[in-house]
């Protein structure tokens, strides 16, 4: 566990938006939204969430930790795949309910669980009045099926 | 109102992650998270949310519409400031619960309600064991106080 805590949201809007005190606004589930981009070329890699513990560990270790909403568990990104995220810079937005991590991805330089570099590999458009996705052709950088296989019982 | 609807999330994971049908996964509040970057230089401008209506209007008009969680209302970004967002490209992520808009900002080329170009104008770091924000010095591009003033009664 980390000892690092975060102060409550100030009631003064100016303090929240222009101040120097980091007081992240966690949602009712205790999470903030995190946008993750590549520090070198700015590519959007993923959108994830952090609770206070994941955020504290990220600040203290410089390695990105998240809260997995699907597994309901703390998630040190890269623990299985080796694709850890080294945090080059963290930013927050005007009302401190979102974070931006600029990272260097280790391992295969892949962030998506499908093996691709980015989770955003499909464009959205309207075709005959229906929302339609087009794959941008980006290829897996590692064998996700092998990496994330479950141990046989 | 828009007539455009969105199909339910497929139960098949492969269809969700690799398919061509756009089936955005709205959260229990009916929203998806939207990351907005500048189409030209990739700068992260803001994080916002869309409900189905805002998403449909965005796809149909090519101008970004959001759902304002603070005002509980549909929000055509730029309606007050003139800083509309023209959508150059929309993408979705592997499990279709987040969207990425690459936009050209009209008007003052400013996205933040403080008048700055981006909402992410402060870095986060640890100073003496406390989360501390440092302003990056980006200046307002329009007079937010004047633009968003309330009409006197």
Curated annotation (Swiss-Prot), chains A, B:
Full protein name: Phosphoribosyl-AMP cyclohydrolase
Family: Belongs to the PRA-CH family.
Keyword Metal-binding belongs to the record: yes
Keyword Cytoplasm: yes
Pathway stated in the Swiss-Prot or TrEMBL entry: Amino-acid biosynthesis; L-histidine biosynthesis; L-histidine from 5-phospho-alpha-D-ribose 1-diphosphate: step 3/9
Gene this protein is translated from: hisI
Cofactor: Mg(2+); Zn(2+)
Gene3D superfamilies noted in UniProt: 4.10.80.70, Phosphoribosyl-AMP cyclohydrolase
Main location: cytoplasm
Keyword entries, A-Z: Amino-acid biosynthesis, Cytoplasm, Histidine biosynthesis, Hydrolase, Magnesium, Metal-binding, Zinc
Localization per record: Cytoplasm
GO cellular component annotations of the record: cytoplasm
Record: residues binding Zn(2+): 94, 112, 119
One matching Pfam family: PRA-CH
Gene Ontology molecular function, alphabetical: magnesium ion binding; phosphoribosyl-AMP cyclohydrolase activity; zinc ion binding
InterPro entries reported in the protein's UniProt record: PRA-CH (IPR026660), PRib_AMP_CycHydrolase_dom (IPR002496), PRib_AMP_CycHydrolase_sf (IPR038019)
Entry EC no(s): 3.5.4.19
GO biological-process terms attached to the record: L-histidine biosynthetic process
Cofactor binding, per record: Binds 1 Mg(2+) ion per subunit.
Binding-site residues, Mg(2+): 93, 95, 97
Biological function: Catalyzes the hydrolysis of the adenine ring of phosphoribosyl-AMP.
Reaction(s) catalysed (UniProt annotation): 1-(5-phospho-beta-D-ribosyl)-5'-AMP + H2O = 1-(5-phospho-beta-D-ribosyl)-5-[(5-phospho-beta-D-ribosylamino)methylideneamino]imidazole-4-carboxamide
Broad class of enzyme this protein falls into: hydrolase
